């Protein structure tokens, strides 16, 4: 692992904080009770635009319907630097002041190594928002594009390395959840990729347990269309930066998105119907039954995280 630009934040940690131990770089503003207040904090009702409301309320709907969060959760949010992950983190921060229980947030950023200083604007924003974080520079991107990667696609290898490291960080910091910023476009593209390439009828789970339930992978923005996320990111003035990966825009997912754009043109309402149908289907699939009894292996406990 390459040592990166985030090392200066290490000194922000109080001696008693568990985030200080171990390798890597982190700072703590609210990650534990020993370092300061954690979880939900009183906050005034800010005026939000329509796009911002869509993001915050849709995240709340996903949280409530699937029971993805509960009291005492410690949620690690994977922040890549794109609009999706920034809006996810901002929306969860707002929902801390809405839900009737306490949960904690920690941003996890793994710089892939193409531009080691690309995340320079992230740290001041996190400090301003009062969000704990772990930031590090890796070599995952260059490794995925090197001769070392003989068997897998570039995206598969890079994603596998990042996911493995994120799981390690969740274990180090005692996080119960890992939140990813996938949106409705990602759900639709994944559904058709699974159908056309693998012969499977499957999408992206909103709440999925790993390690015998020790960690839950969640996707609170899976009901939100990308256009609302982009608009909300601009309105919140989030410090989004460009993706420096040389393979960006040349992936199987981007090719599927282009194919789907042709499908959307078949009828006037094709896109709306496809999005509404698949998001409802995925939400129903990941929601526990009304009586609270759940026999499905992939669903989460029926806790409440909505309005």
What do the predicted segments below correspond to?
Residues 238-307:
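The feature marks non-catalytic terminal segments
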Residues 54, 161, 224, 251, ...:
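Conserved active-site and cofactor/substrate-binding residues in soluble primary-metabolism enzymes
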Residues 5-8, 14-20, 27-191, 197-200, ...:
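ATP-dependent adenylation/nucleotidyltransferase module used to activate substrates
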Residues 105, 178, 185-265:
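Catalytic subdomain that performs nucleotidyl-dependent activation
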Residues 158-171, 204-213, 260-280:
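Short, basic, helix/turn surface patches
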Residues 118, 152, 192, 196, ...:
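Alpha-helix boundary/capping detector
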Residues 114, 140-142, 208, 224, ...:
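Residue-level detector of flexible, active-site-proximal loop/helix-junction positions
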């Amino acid at each position: 692992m390459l040592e990166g630009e985030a090392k200066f934040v290490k000194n922000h940690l109080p001696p008693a904080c568990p985030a200080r131990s171990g390798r890597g770089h982190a700072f703590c503003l609210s990650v534990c009770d020993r370092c300061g207040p954690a979880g939900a904090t009183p906050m005034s009702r800010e005026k939000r635009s329509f796009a911002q409301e869509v993001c915050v309320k849709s995240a709340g709907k996903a949280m409530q319907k699937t029971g993805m969060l509960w009291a005492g959760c410690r949620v690690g949010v994977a922040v890549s630097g794109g609009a999706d992950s920034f809006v996810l983190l901002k929306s969860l921060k707002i929902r801390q002041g809405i839900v009737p229980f306490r949960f904690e947030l920690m941003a996890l950023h793994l710089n892939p190594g193409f531009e080691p200083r690309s995340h320079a604007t992230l740290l001041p924003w996190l400090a301003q928002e009062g969000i704990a974080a772990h930031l590090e520079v890796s070599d995952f991107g260059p490794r995925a594009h090197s001769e070392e990667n003989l068997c897998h696609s570039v995206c598969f290898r890079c994603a596998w390395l990042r996911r493995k490291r994120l799981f390690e960080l969740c274990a180090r910091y005692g996080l119960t959840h890992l939140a990813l910023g996938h949106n409705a476009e990602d759900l639709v593209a994944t559904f058709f990729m699974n159908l056309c390439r693998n012969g499977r009828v499957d999408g992206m789970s909103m709440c999925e347990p790993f390690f015998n339930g020790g960690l839950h992978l969640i996707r609170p923005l899976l009901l939100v269309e990308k256009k609302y996320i982009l608009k909300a990111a601009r309105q919140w003035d989030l410090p989004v930066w460009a993706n420096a990966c040389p393979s960006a825009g040349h992936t199987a997912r981007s090719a599927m998105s282009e194919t789907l754009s042709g499908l959307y043109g078949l009828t006037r309402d094709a896109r709306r119907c496809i999005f509404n149908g698949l998001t409802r289907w995925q939400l129903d699939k990941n929601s526990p039954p009304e009586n609270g009894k759940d026999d499905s292996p992939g669903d989460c406990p029926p806790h409440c995280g909505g309005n």
